Amino acid sequence: FIGVLIVSSFVLNAEEGTEVESVTIIGTKDDVKELAGSGSVLSNADLKKQMDTDIHKILSAVPGVYFRTEDGYGLRPNISIRGTSIDRSAKVTLMEDGILIAPAPYTSASAYYFPTTGRINSVEVLKGPASISQGPSTIGGAINLISTPIPEANSGKFIQELGQNGMVRTHAYYGGNSGNLGALVEVHEHQTDGFDGIANVGGDTGFNKSDVMFKARYESGNHSLTLKMLEMNEKSEQSYVGLSQASFNKNPRLRYGMTQYDVMDNDGDQMSLTYAGSIGNFDVVASKWSNDYHRDWFKVDKANNTKAHGVSNGINSVISAANGGNANAQAILDGKLAVQVKLKHNNRFYTNEGFQFKVSTEVGMHALTVGYRDMEDSESRYQEYECFDQSASGVNSALYSCGTGYTGSNNRLRESEATSYYIEDKITLGKLAITIGHRSEDYDQVENRWDDGTPTRTQLNSSYPKTKDGDYTSTGFGATYDLNANMQLVAGFHEGMTAMFGTDPETADNMELGLRYSEGMSDLEVFYFQSDYESLKAACTNSQGGACDDGDVFDGGAVDVSGVEVSGSMIVEGDNGTSYPIGLTYTSTDATFANSFDDDGEYWGVVAAGDDVPYVPDSSLALVAGFVTSNGLSGNLRWVKNGSSCSTASCGINQTIDAHSFIDLNIRKALNENVDIYMGVENLLDDEDVVARAPKDGARSQKPRTMKVGFALNF
């Protein structure tokens, strides 16, 4: 990539660089107060303080956002906003530069792909009625990740990090303008050997991830046309299999020997063409995009032991049995009983392409915006099996074909089409601003399935193809009132939805009341929110761990969610030019089922009215305190505490997740105007808590105490 940067620097004359704004849905921190609802902007300066590569940690600075750690690196995040289902972030609208980024936002929204956080320039989060413009999921909100923008003048950056467990991260970009043309080349490489050990057999548990991005822009007067291309690859030795509670108590950073062959292979490419400009009194942004993504997660599916050892075959059942005290189940996990282990290629190809535009204009007291999106996406599966033999001494054989009947299962092709539009009118009446919004969604899907066990997808199941469709219209309004130059009241209501196929959409009525205060170097926001679900819906996934078929939808009935969000920041000026920035984020949440039911353990299990919604903590707190000196030395200490939650509504033994926390430290020194060096320590106290019991009901701990050092060169 160094050669590419050199070529770019030859083409563009070097100058001091400032960056051109990318496509955003909010803008700057100052633009948040213009929202008819709650929102947050985390700037590039915010992200630079900790140099995080885990989106979970970045979002800890945003109230109302919850997360469930899985691999310790944030490779496949689980994010919830204001109580939405957390599994694979499927109920949050995810975007990069304003374009939907989930592998297949309608067909399969689960975020097995998530943009590489280390290359992201800034982050926007929308909640409340403000999110009605950013479907398809509008109950909780939307997250927009802003990629590195093209600099106005020629400039670049080179970042190099080294850390424990063989961690190496390289991030470099260069770009600029020459006449009407601008361009940017960016490379991000990140790898580590991982922090978990594999019992009996050893091996790495890390990843190797690479992104290459190119942008080009042509500008003429008030018009610009931007081409963006991205290619990404990932290989990660990650497993779905967590630990039984007994194993966790002995060594929380262990992987079972049977997971030796577990590996995720990802690759994909993205391309978008975006027009932005003014035509008369109209501001127009229009984008055409095409995203292709492939992933094959080869991982333990079953331990074929029912006849020999009397334990159900599914790995989720084995862990559950071990948690229930079954000695044979624990022995299988420990590699002390001989079993045949079956692994499945969770092999999927995704497409996501479409066109969208937004037109804005002002007429008197009205600021009108109209948006439209027409898109199609798909998910194609072909899932083959392979097997190996685990001996009673914990030694694994080589992989071999499982034989007849294990060629493949759940092989399918799902293709969806969707159109949506929204209309928004912001009416300004002096200190009062009222925003009224309307959104409409129309979507349909065709699904084909092939018979299990066939070597190729040649024998179409007699029950297919099947066609499913749905539509939904929603309205919302928000209002802001400026009490004075420093204080603003906010109120809003909106009907939210999440598209579902084969059943009615998930719907909820949502309201919020808030207060914003800003004066000098102090800011404070307090919001109360409430979501009344008519029907909480969830689609079965492999990561969820229920006894259900992947893709089936389960109705959780009425659910009540309410809470309080607080965020504040201030800068205290000290002596000798030293300042002390302090930030606080707090969320208190009550999310409970309103009805009692039992789905025979397929997804929700046994639910009693008043049970908590899984993985929504009762509270979350993030406190950041730092210092900035006049000689270029700065530092930040971050303490994040997540309250207790449960992995299931019934919250039985070994299904609780107690309150847990971590502390991160970052020290930075500017050697001159162009060179910074820094040091970071994650999980400073090396806490070893249960932070999740998924995927597959297994207990998981947070990343251990880990140190890294790095430098950043601006040129």
Give residue spans per PLM region.
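Structural signature of Gram-negative outer-membrane beta-barrels, strongest in the C-terminal barrel
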Residues: Y350, E362-D377, G403-Y533, E573, ...
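Extracytoplasmic beta-strand/coil segments of soluble accessory domains associated
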Residues: S60-I99
